[in-house]
C-alpha cells in the first residue's frame, strides 16, 4: 500500500511518499516513491511479534495521521540488516506509524528517558533466542 508521510523519516526528509509491502507476518519492506539518488529501501519488523511493545503516540502525530477510534493503525520498527539475519539490529525508539484507513504515515521519535527498555540497536538474535526458548 502507498502512504503519504505527514512527518518525515529521519535521514530521508526529502521523501514524502512510500510504498509498504508485507513480506510475511514479521517483516515488511518500505520503499520511497521518488527518483532521488538518495533512495529509500528498508526492512521493517512488526515489534509486537518480537517483544512487549507499547508507547504513547504523541498528540501531534495523532492529529497529522487523523487517527480516531476507527483507524487501522500499523506500527513497524526499522531493521538494520547484517549478513547474518540474526545479527541485524532493530530500532525500537523510532517506530513508523501508519493509518491504513487514509494512507498517512509518520515516524515517531521516542525518548530513551521515557522508554528505557527500548533500544535503537537491539540485536534481532536476542528476540529469536527468546522465541526458541518458549518453544
UniProtKB/Swiss-Prot annotation:
It is found in: Cytoplasm. GO terms for biological process: bacterial-type flagellum assembly; regulation of translation. The keyword Chaperone applies. InterPro entries: Flagellar_assembly_factor_FliW, Flagellar_assmbl_FliW_dom_sf. The keyword Cytoplasm applies. Its main location: cytoplasm. Gene3D superfamilies: BH3618-like. It comes from the Bacteria. Keywords: Bacterial flagellum biogenesis, Chaperone, Cytoplasm, Translation regulation. GO terms for cellular component: cytoplasm. Interacts with translational regulator CsrA and flagellin(s). Acts as an anti-CsrA protein, binds CsrA and prevents it from repressing translation of its target genes, one of which is flagellin. Binds to flagellin and participates in the assembly of the flagellum. Belongs to the FliW family. This is Flagellar assembly factor FliW 1. It comes from Helicobacter pylori (strain HPAG1).
